[in-house]
Structure formats: C-alpha cells, structure tokens
Amino acid sequence: MEASQDTFTVAGRTFQSRLLVGTGKYRDLDETREAIEVSGAEIVTVAIRRTNIGQNPDEPNLLDVISPERYTLLPNTAGCYTAKDAVRTCRLARELLDGHNLVKLEVLGDEKTLYPDIPATLEAAEQLVADGFDVMVYTSDDPITAKRLEEVGCVAVMPLGAPIGSGLGIQNHWNILTIVENASVPVLVDAGVGTASDASEAMELGCDGVLMNTAIAGAQRPVLMASAMRKAVEAGREAYLAGRIPRKRFASASSPLEGTFF
C-alpha cells in the first residue's frame, strides 16, 4: 500500500498524517509554528481554557500562526475536572470557531495523576454527542471503558499510554492491543509518549494514530524531535502493515542448511 492510500479517517474527515500534536509548553509561538510544520501533523489540539484563540483580543492569538485553513483544530478540555466544565468548554470552542464540532474530551480525576475521571467522562460524552459534537475522548487503558465510550457515540477513543507528561512510554501493551482489537472507531494513544520509539511502538500495536505535546515541546530541541516523531509514526505504521515476524524462544537460522554445497 502506498503512503498516499494509507489514510486516517475520523468523523468523516480524512488525513494523511497519523501524528496529532498539541500547542502548549513551547517557548514562543514561532517555535510552536515551526515544530508543528516539521511534524507533518494535520490535526492540532488546543487547550481552550489555556490558549488564546480569540477570547482575549489583547494577547497573542494562536490562530495567527496555526491557521484553521491549513490545520484541523481539535479543541480540548484540558484542565476540566467536572462533566459540566468540560461540556461548557466544548460549547465555548464551537462558538469561537464558528460551529466547529470536532472536540477532544478529557475530564480529569485529580491533579497528581491527571488520570481521567471515567464516570464524569462518560457523562460529558453522552451530553456532547447528544448536542451534535464529534467527540474524540481521552480515557484510561481499560478495554471495557473504551468500548463503553465508543457505544455512547464517541468517534475515537484515546487511551493513555502512561500519565500525561510523564514520558514513561506505553505501560500496558496488552490493554492497548485489546482496545485496538475490540474497537470499530479509531484508537489513538494519548499521553505518556517520551521519545520516538514510544510513538513507533503505539503504531506497531495497530493504533490508528498518536497524540502528543510534551514529548515534542519539552525536548531539548523541539523542532528536531518533531521530525523524529513524524518518522517514528510513519515507520511504526509501515511495520504494522508489513507484519512482524513471530517471537520465538529459540533461534531460527536465517540461512537454511538445505541445499548447501558442503
């Protein structure tokens, strides 16, 4: 399969890149713009409660460097700890972005772990779906929860690989694999990626994409890391499509003895 044919579709929108990136933690908007350009990402997530996209006319506007005409914006509810706040934030985003209805839902449980509050996440997801939103949802790596979120109408499930910003990489490969196997909507690892091998690993498990922010913005050289992540996601996807060899306990000679000359 050619790269141009291996597209990623969510909520009826089709993309070439399977790397989704955030906009926080960069030194300035110029670095934000350059890193996102180099990443090749087409979907860019924005924390509505923390990022100015027009709410504050006297402050720098992210949309001046991340144009909605070039990128698909994915407003998110980072910093929300209740379903009510998350729903309100999504409605604000829709108002600011002229009816844009693709959102990333996250309802956090506490400040220490930033793990999702699952009951509140389900409550918010149900309300947002009923209100006409296309909901991509941050969740735990529990396969049952992921399936339940799909059943309430979320257009993508986004299990954490590890706590947000931890850089620990995927901690529970088997759960992520089970979520992928059970899902009929896209699955994207969201949170915990620390370096390129983590992103590649997520794709090798069969995930449809990877979303990251800190792994790029927090690197010593963010623009170079953005390039590395782009290649890692592409390599991991190709490896998944190619089909890895099975793991074996013992050796298997790469040069068979049959037909040897002596």
Curated annotation (Swiss-Prot):
Pathway: Cofactor biosynthesis; thiamine diphosphate biosynthesis
Catalytic activity, EC: 2.8.1.10
Chemical reaction(s) catalysed: [ThiS sulfur-carrier protein]-C-terminal-Gly-aminoethanethioate + 2-iminoacetate + 1-deoxy-D-xylulose 5-phosphate = [ThiS sulfur-carrier protein]-C-terminal Gly-Gly + 2-[(2R,5Z)-2-carboxy-4-methylthiazol-5(2H)-ylidene]ethyl phosphate + 2 H2O + H(+)
Subcellular location: Cytoplasm
Sequence positions that bind 1-deoxy-D-xylulose 5-phosphate: G165, A191, G192, N213, T214
InterPro entries, alphabetized: Aldolase_TIM (IPR013785), Thiazole_synthase_ThiG (IPR033983), ThiG (IPR008867)
Active-site annotation: K104 (schiff-base intermediate with dxp)
GO biological process terms held by the UniProt record: thiamine diphosphate biosynthetic process
CDD domains linked: ThiG
Xref: Pfam families: ThiG (PF05690)
Predominant localisation class: cytoplasm
Keywords associated with the record: Cytoplasm, Schiff base, Thiamine biosynthesis, Transferase
Gene Ontology, cellular component aspect: cytoplasm
Gene Ontology MF: a single term: thiazole synthase activity
Protein's job: Catalyzes the rearrangement of 1-deoxy-D-xylulose 5-phosphate (DXP) to produce the thiazole phosphate moiety of thiamine. Sulfur is provided by the thiocarboxylate moiety of the carrier protein ThiS. In vitro, sulfur can be provided by H(2)S.
Family statement: Belongs to the ThiG family.
Subunit record text: Homotetramer. Forms heterodimers with either ThiH or ThiS.
UniProt name for this protein: Thiazole synthase
